[in-house]
Amino acid sequence: MSADASTTPAADSNVTSTPETSTTPAAPAPEVTAVESTTAPNASQPHSASLYVGELDPSVTEAMLYELFSSIGQVASIRVCRDAVTRRSLGYAYVNYNNTADGERALEDLNYTLIKGKPCRIMWSQRDPALRKTGQGNVFIKNLDSAIDNKALHDTFAAFGNILSCKVAQDEFGNSKGYGFVHYETAEAANNAIKHVNGMLLNDKKVFVGHHISKKDRQSKFEEMKANFTNVYIKNIDQDVTEEEFRELFEKFGEITSATLSRDQEGKSRGFGFVNFSTHESAQAAVDEMNEKEIRTQKLYVGRAQKKHEREEELRKQYEAARLEKASKYQGVNLYVKNLTDDVDDEKLRELFGPYGTITSAKVMRDTNIERTQTPESDKEKENKEATKENEKESSEAEKAEKTEEKPADSGDEKKEDKESKKADKKGLGKSKGFGFVCFSSPDEASKAVTEMNQRMVNGKPLYVALAQRKDVRRSQLEASIQARNTIRQQQAAAAAGMPQPYMQPAVFYGPGQQGFIPGQRGGIAFPPQPGMVMAGIPGGRPGQYPGPFPGQQGGRGMGPNQQLPPNFQGIPMGAMQGPVPNGMGYPQGMAQVQFGRGAGGRGQVPGMPNMGQGMRGPGYGQGRGGVPVQQGQMRPGQGGRGQNAAQAPAGRPEEAVAGGLTAQALSAAPPPQQKQMLGEALYPKIQAQQPELAGKITGMLLEMENTELLSLLEDEEALRAKVDEALNVYDEYMKNKGGESEATGEAAKPKEAAKETSTEENKS
């Protein structure tokens, strides 16, 4: 006969509902409190052969239990109860014997046996929950010494009758909570134990023993106690008040059963105490009259004495209410700002966001631990050096004042003092963490600030501005994004395994003289192709995915007479293909050869197609023939890559035409996604002339500016040079902070590898 996990005796759940013991010194006789009963069958009912084994280590298995319990007799079955989802052990099991006699012997001999270093607790299994929760014969013991464990408690109470279950409540670390339960087979045995043990000393501690009271009954009785309290708590008591004076303050309200002041180990008053009255009316009168009454320059607090768990519950409710109120108050008005430079402080942050509304608070988060890296001797040396420098400056200034008439030095000294004081203030603060918070007075102001300040360049770094979110909200959003990403990966894996996948817009390469469009690294703005363009190969190239061989293809996949190309597909114009198509130059396989080669021995351009891919220029590319930007490792003239035509026609310099002919009218006429592309193509050759290695990086940084500013930079060479220098300084500082190797000339660490990674990602997209 096997038992389910649902037959867990209530003793396991008892710990969660156990009340806190009263720590009030002046409290009356303690209440009889206990937890859910763990009743077993009565003496008149025959025992089954099923045993409950509790207090097990999570690593205990059925095999370990079988090895132990089979020594008593023949075991029918053993089951360790586990969580339905995680399959982790719940810490208890059921052992079924073939006969009841073996079960009785196991209960007597194996109870509290060490299994994996923990004493197990064995009792008869009771499948009927009604019998488990009657509470008959269940005894609650509190104020136990921490040294008393399950076995010691069992040995103490075994003299009064047959014990079905015995347990000392423990915390998560295995330490005693100071109370426990003993479940007798009969109610007479329980009454006998209460009569003899209640009030006795166990390990020099007076214990309370009483009948088990269910949680429901305890709750109703607790509400009744709150309404008819007699114990009063007083705080803010002057330390000079004696026990006699304290008692005299409250004697006028009625008969006092006990009054005490709490004191520390040295005997000094801790400023609070308890007074227990004989009647509720006296206690209520004391609270009404003495609360907030001034005694010896201190206002007393007088109220009903509360138990620890009751105070904790009230504090938790207050904290939760305050948290919800705060969350609703700042909903939609608190902004999170990151990517701040180290020199931005609270005042500067307020200045940045001040134009967009009324700021109630602005805070830059800083490290709280300020480590001093200098010894006191080095500090003194530094002070001496600064003093000598100041003396030298003063002497030089005095000499200059004698020779020429200058402005009074007072104003300069005041400015220096102000600067020094500001520096001293900043030294007292920790290092900026690079992010902060700005709180506005209304949601409209906050949304306006997000719109205007997000991605705004401040001190060479683009700000990230968004509405502040709670940690749990951010975590849930992150989990959702990770789950979506995993779903995409699974779909990609399924597609790679041969499952059909939807048609996607391929990358677009334009012929000579046409405005170029670069798809983004993770996807671009797709628009209908135009005459003269070439399409990159459709991913996959499997049969049925729009194969499109050219005439003369050999070995390529053919296209049936009824097959059609996708509606947005246009092949290479035959006029652009001069000469025969090479073997295997079908679509999509042959189209891969249209792209530039990846190395000195890679594929070159298709014969007869001069300057193919001129539109593919932009940040991250080097300079190739005819002014066309070339990726790192791309073929250059004379490298002799396979498929390159030696008699290729010379290419013009379309960049100069774009830069010279780009006007505000032409820019505004273009679609918004294409405007930055046009500006980037016009800026790139100018920036490359100044910084060949970092032209792509700097172009991308400058494209964060407004379009009107970029147009003015195209016309003003000096302004462009200044912006390039500024971007270069920002990039150098970024590389230093990142730990990369950056030289004073502005060369980035390993630019070739960065360019190679960029090129591979773009071609993947």
UniProtKB/Swiss-Prot annotation:
Composition-biased stretches (Low complexity): 1-37, 628-637
Domain PABC residues, every copy: 659-736
GO terms assigned for molecular function: RNA binding
Gene3D superfamilies per record: 3.30.70.330, c-terminal domain of poly(a) binding protein (1.10.1900.10)
Positions with biased composition (Basic and acidic residues): 377-427, 749-765
Subcellular location(s) per record: Cytoplasm; Nucleus
Any one GO cellular component localisation term in the record: nucleus
Ranges of residues in domain RRM: 49-127, 137-214, 230-307, 333-470
Biased composition (Polar residues): 38-48
InterPro entries: Nucleotide-bd_a/b_plait_sf, PABP-dom, PABP_1234, PABP_HYD_C, PABP_RRM1, RBD_domain_sf, RRM2_I_PABPs, RRM_dom
A single GO BP: mRNA transport
Region ranges (Disordered): 1-49, 364-427, 619-657, 737-765
Record-linked Pfam families: MLLE, RRM_1
Superkingdom of origin organism: Eukaryota
Similarity comment text for this entry: Belongs to the polyadenylate-binding protein type-1 family.
Functional note: Binds the poly(A) tail of mRNA. Appears to be an important mediator of the multiple roles of the poly(A) tail in mRNA biogenesis, stability and translation. In the nucleus, involved in both mRNA cleavage and polyadenylation. Is also required for efficient mRNA export to the cytoplasm. Acts in concert with a poly(A)-specific nuclease (PAN) to affect poly(A) tail shortening, which may occur concomitantly with either nucleocytoplasmic mRNA transport or translational initiation.
PANTHER family assigned: RNA BINDING PROTEIN
Name assigned to this protein: Polyadenylate-binding protein, cytoplasmic and nuclear
Lineage: Eukaryota, Fungi, Dikarya, Ascomycota, Pezizomycotina
Gene from which this protein is expressed: pab1
